[in-house]
């Protein structure tokens, strides 16, 4: 039996690629459900349907298409599936197919499994029947409802073997076999028992409909998109259960939550005393499931961009959004208290973070280059800088010309919005291709000549380590909540959000000219264009350390992600490419060996994450109710009256 879209029998169904356009399909004589026609002509190839070659139905023209004829051939779906939405290339404006898997309802899973078992049994009992005999022309009167199957002996082994093809969005919970049995008993409209007077979970069942060619999108269960498995905001009260919409709610019902609180509050000009807790509640992680150790991490699904063939949009992963961020993780048996740890996906290097892009952004397979069709959108790297001397380059592959394509490049903090350009607010510093202006808080200021297509901009970032941090531990918390999203494990963490005070800095006001705002003394961003020094664009960068960053649950601490991220933003087809090193196009000779390529941060961050996991494991094993976080931190001595030039220019 053919379990998915690959051609296991060495028989090609492909023919003339112009075989069945919508206009030709509409001229054929179709049956009522639009699954069979008298001419036996389907798909791009114009060939007949065949029970041993899975196909799917276009939701627009309603023609049927072989999985092996798609571009590229689809190998991720079981034959006779019904939980999908497909649009053929003849019915899309850009000529690219659209395919999306939906929610896997047990009623549909069971029917799909049973249909495949029918074909499998027929092949086993008739091994000498040629493949062509399975064509719709010869199998229209095939009685699939005469084949009976048992739950334990037939359905359970088949579903177990083909779980990822049948229901990739589902976890294999302990009760799934009982759910399968209940589904068979309850759905008389779809399954019939061999003896209806003894209908129970141990009965033999067959499909009610004898025609396997009726299987199509929505046939068993209406198509429903797979939604996020987590709420937009988590509750943090100690006795409040998690939101009912959480897919993991059953794992939390009996979990005790442990508090990690401070005794000494922080003080800051922008934060009132005792207003912002420095350490959040610790949630006990949900228990492992057997399937957690069998799940193979997957990359995002890449969909080609019609206007830029080398760029792709991403799907099948959660994207960072205001107040929440995501990273792939796995169950860790060697960490029985921490229980879950973050993992890396290829390419294993400094690159654009799959999750940390605005959804309209298109990226290439190297994950170093990005573009967008409309509006300014941002993409952030998966590495960030906290202290030290760093250098990276950005190549402008398209921008700064008269065609409307533009880029803005620079660095940003976690709070900076992804649906805005670099330099939009107080959380990012950017350079504008048009006019070569530097931009902070959306206020452009003259800095250098324009740059555009072919230019390479080098950025030297200096973030001196504050003297007070050498003998003081900043508030930190590494706790993360695992969630399940489309069959994969991810950490969900409250991300840092803009404060009201920082947002108000964007409004021109004489009162904002001088403000009590912490910064990093001696920090700067120096700029090079094609290896030539352009000057220092920014000095005394705003401090990102607690309490200057507060997450969406109103806590002020470092979760291991605070720092400045290399960032690119594109507009109207602009294209920018990161060059993180160690090999650069125009590394200035004046930079000493102490200025490191940003590529070195990748392995450093992994080591930092592993170290935090080990320390947390030791800490929680000794006493799960004790926090290892040190809170008593003096106020940064250099945080005080800061003259913000962007505001000074407006008010004078």
From Swiss-Prot:
Residues 330-519 form the B30.2/SPRY domain. It holds the Pfam family PHD_ash2p_like. A zinc finger (PHD-type) spans 40-94. The keyword Zinc-finger applies. Residues 15-32 have a biased composition (Polar residues). One of its GO terms (molecular function) is zinc ion binding. Zn(2+) 2 binds at residues 58, 61, 88, 91. Residues 1-32, 234-270 are annotated as: Disordered. InterPro entries: ASH2, ASH2-like_PHD, ASH2L-like_WH, B30.2/SPRY, B30.2/SPRY_sf, ConA-like_dom_sf, SPRY_dom, Zinc_finger_PHD-type_CS. Keywords: Metal-binding, Nucleus, Zinc, Zinc-finger. This is Set1 complex component ash2.
């Amino acid at each position: 039996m053919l379990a998915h879209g690959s051609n296991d029998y060495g028989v090609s169904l492909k023919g003339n690629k112009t075989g069945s356009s919508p206009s030709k399909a509409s001229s054929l004589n179709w049956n009522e459900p639009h699954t069979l026609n008298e001419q036996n002509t389907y798909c791009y190839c114009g060939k007949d349907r065949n029970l041993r070659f899975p196909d799917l139905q276009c939701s627009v023209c309603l023609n049927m298409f072989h999985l092996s004829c798609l571009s590229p051939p689809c190998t991720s779906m079981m034959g006779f599936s019904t939980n999908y939405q497909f649009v053929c290339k003849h019915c899309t404006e850009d000529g690219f197919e659209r395919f999306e898997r939906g929610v896997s309802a047990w009623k549909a899973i069971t029917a799909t499994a049973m249909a495949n078992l029918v074909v499998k049994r027929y092949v086993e009992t008739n091994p000498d029947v040629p493949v062509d005999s399975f064509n719709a022309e010869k199998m229209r009167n095939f009685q699939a409802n005469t084949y009976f199957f048992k739950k334990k002996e037939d359905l359970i082994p088949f579903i177990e073997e083909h779980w990822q093809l049948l229901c990739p969005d589902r976890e294999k919970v302990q009760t799934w076999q009982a759910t399968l049995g209940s589904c068979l008993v309850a759905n008389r409209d779809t399954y019939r028992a061999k003896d209806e007077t003894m209908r129970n979970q141990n009965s033999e069942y067959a499909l009610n409909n004898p025609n396997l060619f009726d299987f199509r999108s929505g046939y068993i269960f209406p198509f429903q998109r797979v939604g996020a498995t987590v709420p937009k905001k988590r509750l943090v009260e100690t006795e409040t259960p998690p939101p009912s919409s959480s897919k993991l709610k059953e794992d939390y019902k009996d979990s005790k939550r442990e508090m990690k609180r401070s005794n000494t509050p922080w003080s800051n000009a922008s934060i009132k005393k005792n207003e912002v807790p420095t350490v959040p509640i610790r949630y006990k992680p949900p228990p492992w499931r057997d399937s957690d150790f069998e799940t193979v991490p997957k990359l995002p699904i890449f969909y080609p961009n019609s206007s830029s063939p080398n760029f792709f949009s991403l799907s099948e992963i959660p994207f960072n959004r205001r107040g929440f961020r995501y990273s792939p993780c796995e169950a860790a048996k060697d960490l029985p208290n921490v229980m879950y740890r973050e993992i890396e996906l290829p390419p294993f290097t400094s690159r654009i973070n799959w999750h940390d892009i605005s959804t309209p952004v298109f990226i290439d397979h190297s994950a170093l280059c990005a573009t967008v069709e409309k509006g300014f959108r941002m993409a952030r790297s998966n590495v960030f800088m906290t202290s030290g001397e760093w250098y990276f380059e950005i190549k402008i592959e398209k921008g700064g010309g008269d065609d409307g394509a533009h880029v803005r490049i620079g660095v940003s903090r976690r709070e900076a919005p992804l649906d805005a350009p670099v330099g939009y607010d107080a959380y990012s510093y950017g350079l504008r291709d048009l006019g070569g202006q530097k931009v902070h808080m959306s206020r452009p200021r003259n800095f250098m000549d324009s740059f555009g297509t072919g230019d390479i901009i080098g950025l030297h970032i200096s973030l001196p380590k504050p003297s007070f941090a050498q003998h003081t531990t900043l508030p930190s918390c590494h706790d993360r909540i695992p969630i399940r999203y489309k069959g994969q494990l991810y950490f969900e963490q409250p991300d840092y959000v803009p404060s009201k005070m920082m947002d108000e800095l964007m409004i021109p006001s004489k009162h904002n000219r001088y403000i009590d705002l912490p910064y990093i003394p001696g920090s700067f961003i120096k700029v090079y264009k094609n290896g030539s020094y352009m000057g220092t664009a920014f000095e005394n960068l705003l401090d990102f350390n607690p309490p200057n960053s507060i997450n969406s649950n109103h806590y002020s601490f470092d979760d291991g992600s605070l720092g400045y991220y290399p960032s690119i933003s594109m507009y109207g087809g602009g294209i920018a490419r990161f060059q993180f090193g160690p090999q650069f196009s125009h590394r200035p000779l004046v930079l000493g060996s102490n200025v490191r390529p940003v590529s070195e941060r990748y392995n450093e961050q992994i080591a930092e994450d592993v170290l935090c996991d080990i320390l947390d494991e030791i800490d929680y094993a000794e006493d799960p109710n004790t926090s290892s976080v040190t809170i008593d931190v003096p106020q940064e001595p250099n945080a005080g009256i800061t003259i913000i030039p962007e505001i000074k220019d407006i008010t004078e």
